[in-house]
Amino acid sequence: HPNHEQKYCEESKQYDDHMIKNYDYKDMVYLSDDEMREVTGSDTYYGGSYDEAEAHCHPLNYALGIAKATLSAGAKIYENSPATSYKVLDDHVRVNTKNGSIKADRIVLACNGYLENLEKSLTSKILPMNNYIVATKPLDDETVQKINPKDIAFADSRFVINYFRMSADKRLLFGGGENYSQELSKNIVPIVTRPLEKIYPFLN
């Protein structure tokens, strides 16, 4: 967790100490300014927290794994049939879709930020926010060693965070930049490359 301003470093140290003292979690390590710049390959960062037990998650494989486990448990998955409404009746719940309906004993609204108008009591409580990610072309070994020699997944201290890691085929996956709308941006490249180029100006 690299800090983009020096003032956040003390908070990182306190967080590491808290995890160690209160949870006996001894994998938290505080990295100095120089150490953080060495592992990120960027002089834009100061010190920060490093979780030595951290892991990377492949979102698509994770979703496919959940789907596989769901099917193995006996559930059915209806693709391309979004729920448009539901009604709780005496002995079941009726879920309506564009082309039909499903009878269920109970339902779980697990829609992340994409609930839309399915549950109107929550509509006004959801802030639409889109965050974007780009991937570079495959990088040579020298560049990989320069920008991420320990193969760490980073998320920095900015309010609109920048997060980045290497892919299996040596691309830099970089997320950053947001818009607050139901509509996706038509051109995400400049939104994401601006913060990327500030951190890694040589990756142009």
Language model regions located:
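Active-site substrate-recognition segment that forms the wall
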Residues: A83-V95, G100-D141, Q145-N204
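A conserved short coil-to-beta-strand element within the FAD-binding core of flavoproteins
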Residues: Y30-S42, A75-V93
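Phosphate-binding active sites in nucleotide-utilizing proteins
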Residues: E54, A67, L71-I77, V88, ...
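Surface-exposed helix-capping loop/turn segments at secondary-structure junctions
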Residues: Y23-K26, S72-K76, Y200-N204
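A generic structural signal for well-ordered alpha-helical segments enriched in polar/charged residues
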Residues: K21, K68, S72, R194-K198
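Rossmann-like flavin
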Residues: H1-A69
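Short, contiguous, pocket-lining structural segments
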Residues: D51-Y62, Y78, N99, L184, ...
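General structural feature for long, well-ordered alpha-helical segments within catalytic domains
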Residues: Y8-E11, Y15, S32, Y62, ...
